[in-house]
């Protein structure tokens, strides 16, 4: 809701991982990014950090190695995102008490911003880059951009039913694909 005010409180920083190998990472190693980001956050704040791995990737040796490394950092916690587990916590529940989220280009940043939770976007490919902090150093005073302008902008990235029915959408896509 663009009219929902930005939150100014919260209990922790929610660091949201992305699916390993996801194209939106542009070749970046999500494990290295997560470890580096935890260490960078810790340089700027002592707030509790909760790491939320992507729900479609878990229980690998690399995942467990990362978990071991980051949990050695003071007040860092790991929240599994396995829907089948009895202690599963939804992203909506986690956003309720989050000070802010930190994302690379994850769609979770969209959920955060829509719900008034500030976000730190670590890549220009993030859909919430315009309404997010872009520097971890701002974590204690995250940017809270104009959500109304942002929602208008992203709404114009979609096609209407009429544009599908008229063929305008296909003509546009076809031109991009085939010249």
Placement of each model-derived feature along the sequence:
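Catalytic donor nucleotide-activated moiety binding site of glycosyltransferases and closely related
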Residues: 38-86
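Leloir-type glycosyltransferase catalytic cores
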Residues: 1-10, 129-179
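A donor-sugar binding/catalytic signature common to diverse glycosyltransferases
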Residues: 86-133
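Conserved alpha-helical elements of sugar-nucleotide-dependent glycosyltransferases
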Residues: 29-37
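Short, well-ordered alpha-helix to beta-strand connector turns
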Residues: 10, 46, 74, 97-98, ...
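A nucleotide-sugar donor-handling region in carbohydrate enzymes
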Residues: 1-30
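Short, solvent-exposed loop/turn segments at secondary-structure junctions
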Residues: 18-22, 55-58, 84, 107-109, ...
């Amino acid at each position: 809701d663009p009219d929902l005010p930005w939150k100014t409180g919260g209990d922790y920083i929610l660091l949201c991982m992305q699916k390993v190998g996801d194209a939106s990472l542009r070749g970046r190693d999500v494990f290295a990014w997560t470890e580096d980001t935890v260490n960078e956050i810790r340089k700027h704040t002592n707030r509790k950090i909760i790491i939320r791995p992507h729900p479609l990737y878990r229980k690998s040796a690399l995942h467990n190695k990362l978990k071991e490394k980051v949990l050695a950092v003071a007040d860092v916690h790991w929240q599994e995102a396995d829907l089948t587990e009895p202690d599963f916590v939804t992203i909506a529940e986690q956003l309720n008490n989050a000070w802010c989220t930190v994302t690379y280009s994850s769609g979770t940043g969209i959920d955060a911003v829509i719900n008034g939770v500030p976000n730190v976007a670590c890549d220009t490919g993030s859909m919430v880059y315009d309404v997010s902090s872009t520097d971890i150093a701002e974590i204690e005073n995250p940017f809270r951009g104009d959500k109304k302008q942002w929602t208008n902008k992203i709404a114009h990235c979609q096609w209407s039913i009429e544009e599908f029915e008229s063929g305008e959408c296909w003509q546009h896509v076809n031109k991009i694909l085939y010249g």
